[in-house]
Amino acid sequence: SITDIVSEKDIDAALESVKAAGSFNYKIFFQKVGLAGKSAADAKKVFEILDRDKSGFIEQDELGLFLQNFRASARVLSDAETSAFLKAGDSDGDGKIGVEEFQALVKA
């Protein structure tokens, strides 16, 4: 589970920082949740949790549910937040985020 990789306390802080609609910033979130300093292997484990359909990619609908992977009661990202997140992570322009792209995004 995600709490094997990041702490409940850090999840609380990260979710608190994005509670307001439109406030999601992936760089701040990854820093607050403690992922920015984790290894590529840990980032890959988180990627595998986010990739709900196990396609090997995080698609736009999965990105919308991003916060709920950290806590089921968290809000859904808005379309604008989801699009910006996808654009930031999709370096090859295929409309989805692969594992290497996610690892780079976490470190950004």
Curated annotation (Swiss-Prot):
Pfam families in the cross-refs: EF-hand_7 (PF13499)
Residues binding Ca(2+) 1: 51, 53, 55, 57, 59, 62
Presence of keyword Metal-binding: yes
Gene3D superfamilies: EF-hand (1.10.238.10)
Residues annotated with N-acetylserine modification: 1
Record InterPro entries: EF-hand-dom_pair (IPR011992), EF_Hand_1_Ca_BS (IPR018247), EF_hand_dom (IPR002048), Parvalbumin (IPR008080)
Binding-site residues for Ca(2+) 2, renumbered to this chain: 90, 92, 94, 96, 101
Gene Ontology MF terms: calcium ion binding
Superkingdom assignment: Eukaryota
Keywords from the UniProt entry: Acetylation, Calcium, Metal-binding, Muscle protein, Repeat
Gene Ontology CC, one term: cytoplasm
Domain EF-hand: 38-73, 77-108
Family from the record: Belongs to the parvalbumin family.
Additional information: This parvalbumin has an isoelectric point of 4.5.
Function: In muscle, parvalbumin is thought to be involved in relaxation after contraction. It binds two calcium ions.
Entry protein name: Parvalbumin beta
Native source species: Pelophylax lessonae (Pool frog)
